[in-house]
Curated annotation (Swiss-Prot):
A divalent metal cation binds at residues 53, 107, 172. It comes from the Bacteria. It is found in: Periplasm. Keywords: Metal-binding, Periplasm, Signal, Transport. This is Putative metal-binding protein TM_0123. Belongs to the bacterial solute-binding protein 9 family. GO terms for molecular function: metal ion binding. The keyword Cell membrane does not apply. Residues 1-15 form the signal peptide. Part of an ATP-binding cassette (ABC) transport system involved in metal import. Binds a metal with high affinity and specificity and delivers it to the membrane permease for translocation into the cytoplasm. It comes from Thermotoga maritima (strain ATCC 43589 / DSM 3109 / JCM 10099 / NBRC 100826 / MSB8). One of its GO terms (cellular component) is periplasmic space.
């Protein structure tokens, strides 16, 4: 009887490890990998250094999606190439109440409150349905992530509270949700990846010159994009990383790294 039970356990383990979860962007790869451990094969579609707004499928990418048992995607227009794979795709943005979303801004993974209350719990539910025999382990990992997020939230409030009501300028609106949560106004040079800076935006920046406390860009953007503003505002720009191009191992580590950059910029 014991041999039969052991055989059944081994069969279930083999079947599960044979399952493939594909995540479109690195932040969800970090979360799903931490939740599942070695329970399944977790693959990343868009490399961290690539621009997910401009990503298009190569034949090898299409093959990866075809072979996936589950696809974890952001939604909010970030992955238009997933239309034919919708039946096996979970869009993380569906976990978040529509009233909390800002227009079509897709950068929900950078909001630690969204992660704590919607994204991690939502992915936990999806994964325990896929791997019910691993519920205990997945729950433990989810609790570890939430505990880390609590620390990030606490540290962010402590660091940013003195700057409530101040203004931050970014080249791209990736940290819109984050700065809103902690009471700072964000002005972006463009509303998306393919829009140039409008004259009205420049006027707003100059009008709020005395309120601006930091300038940021992303790793994929050239330093020159903020050079004129650096001169005008007499302020150095810093790099915030929305995707984890420097090899962060967890989503909490990614948020912590960005918080440390923000703190450095505010000194």
């Amino acid at each position: 009887m014991k041999k039969i039970l052991l055989l059944l356990v081994l069969i279930v383990a083999v079947l599960n490890f044979g399952k493939t979860i594909v995540t479109t962007i690195n932040p969800y790869y970090l979360i799903v990998s931490q939740l599942l451990g070695d329970t399944a094969s977790v693959k990343l579609l868009v490399p961290p250094g690539a621009n997910p707004h401009l990503f298009s499928l190569k034949p090898s990418d299409a093959k990866t999606l075809e072979e996936a048992d589950l696809i974890v995607a952001n939604g909010l227009g970030l992955e238009p190439y997933l239309e034919k794979y919708r039946e096996k795709t979970v869009f993380v943005s569906d976990f978040i109440p529509a009233l909390l979303l800002i227009d079509d801004n897709p950068h929900i993974w950078l909001d630690p409150f969204f992660l704590k209350y919607y994204i991690v719990p939502g992915l936990y539910q999806v994964l325990i349905e896929k791997f019910p025999e691993k519920q205990s382990e997945i729950k433990q990992k989810a609790e570890e992530i939430v505990s880390g997020l609590d620390t990030v939230i606490r540290d962010s409030f402590k660091a940013l509270l003195p700057y409530t009501g101040k203004t931050v300028v970014m080249a791209h609106p990736s940290f819109t949700y984050f700065f809103k949560e902690f009471g700072l106004e964000l002005i972006t040079l463009s509303s998306g990846h393919e829009h140039s800076t409008s004259f009205s935006t420049i006027k707003e920046i100059l009008r709020k010159k005395e309120q601006i406390v930091a300038l940021f860009r992303e790793p994929q953007q050239p330093a020159e994009i903020l050079s004129s503003l650096e001169k005008e505002l007499r302020m150095k720009s810093f790099v915030l990383d929305p995707l984890g191009v420097n090899g962060e191992k967890t989503i909490v580590e990614l948020l912590r790294k960005n918080l440390s950059v923000i703190q450095e910029a505010l000194k």
